[in-house]
Amino acid sequence: MILKEGEVVFEVPDKLTVTKKDEVFYNPRMKTCRDISIAVIQAFLNLYHKRDKFYIADALAGSGIRGLRYAKELEFNGELKVFLNDINPKAYEKIINNAKLNEIENIDVFNEDANTFLSKHFRFFNVVDIDPFGSPAPYVEQAIRALVTRNGLLCLTATDTAALCGRSKKSCLRKYLAYPLFGRDCHEFALRVLVGYVMRMATKYELALKPVFCHATDHYVRVYLVTDRGAKRADKVFEMLGYVKDVNGIKIIKKFEEGYEKGFAGPLYIGNLYDKALVEEALKIAEKREFSERVLKILNAIKGESAINQVGCYDTHQIGKMLKISVPPMQDIINKLKEMGFNAVVTHYNPKGIKTDATLKNVIEAIYQCTKIR
């Protein structure tokens, strides 16, 4: 069966399934994720990459659609090359055939274990993309080692949201060495746990990673982190880590150096998840390339979030239950908070979640005022 995604046509098995047993894995539900990846990596190229070569690794390539789209759709004046790898021999053959189908030549294809492939390319790639079925944790260290130590971009997908979102705490502790936070904004804390884990793993190599873009969509979370080198920079990473406890919608935050206390989630990242300039550039690129309304909606929401450094969000449904009132429309609450002098947006991951620099007391006041108006 021949399909098209972005500017790439490709062949997949007639029966599309999404399990680990698939001979050659392709998930059509991840098109939104791949579209956003194109926008984010292109934005990174435009803003931060100053050299004449740009090498990308797609270490778990499956049918190759992600890596082939990078090779064909990313715009760069210098040498752009994508290295696609999959341990499955049939996937390896499929990638080669799909590349021929699209007349794509700026690629190399490998048939190896992902960690073996990455270990053979020490400090080589400008971008390493890990898009597994499940957790990226088994590949994180080799992915970090395969990146250039300054302005390298690490892109990770995790589909094990039961662990990261707190439904399986032991699994999260085992994979990410952290306790998750289960609640209305658990998807944001899934991002923060994953980012915090990656940052900690990098410090042993005297590398400081920081997030520049993240999103939680459908059944997965996706994070993008940029590398920088130096022991002092790596030491400062721990200042951006901590522990969080949710008490009736209020987030209590402890610094990493204070240590773990029972009932808290973490260690996790407690800083801003976004590089505002990169988010704005990615949105411009997505608009120019006429990506789907859904992609634009996600990027627009994240643009608003990037200007607010709040850990978690206020869930209006939870507040309504607590106050025993009917919650007014979200946009009314947002407008009221802005009238009160605060910045406020609806989160991209929770349609009932508000990210704002206001306190919970201010949010409750805004809800009451909107209720009276109605």
UniProtKB/Swiss-Prot annotation:
Which family, according to UniProt? Belongs to the class I-like SAM-binding methyltransferase superfamily. Trm1 family.
Q: Which SUPFAM superfamilies match?
A: S-adenosyl-L-methionine-dependent methyltransferases
**Gene that encodes it:** trm1
Q: What is the lineage of its organism?
A: Archaea, Methanobacteriati, Methanobacteriota, Methanomada group, Methanococci
Q: Name one Pfam family in it.
A: TRM
Q: Name one GO molecular function term.
A: tRNA binding
Gene3D superfamilies per UniProt: N2,N2-dimethylguanosine tRNA methyltransferase, C-terminal domain, Vaccinia Virus protein VP39
What keywords appear on the UniProt entry?
Methyltransferase, RNA-binding, S-adenosyl-L-methionine, Transferase, tRNA processing, tRNA-binding
Enzyme class of the recorded protein, top EC level: transferase
User: Biological process GO terms, please?
Assistant: tRNA N2-guanine methylation
Its EC number is 2.1.1.216
Q: What does this protein do?
A: Dimethylates a single guanine residue at position 26 of a number of tRNAs using S-adenosyl-L-methionine as donor of the methyl groups.
Q: Trm1 methyltransferase domain: from which residue to which, for each copy?
A: 1-367
Known catalytic reactions = guanosine(26) in tRNA + 2 S-adenosyl-L-methionine = N(2)-dimethylguanosine(26) in tRNA + 2 S-adenosyl-L-homocysteine + 2 H(+)
Q: Which residues bind S-adenosyl-L-methionine?
A: R34, R66, D86, D113, A114
Q: What is this protein called?
A: tRNA (guanine(26)-N(2))-dimethyltransferase
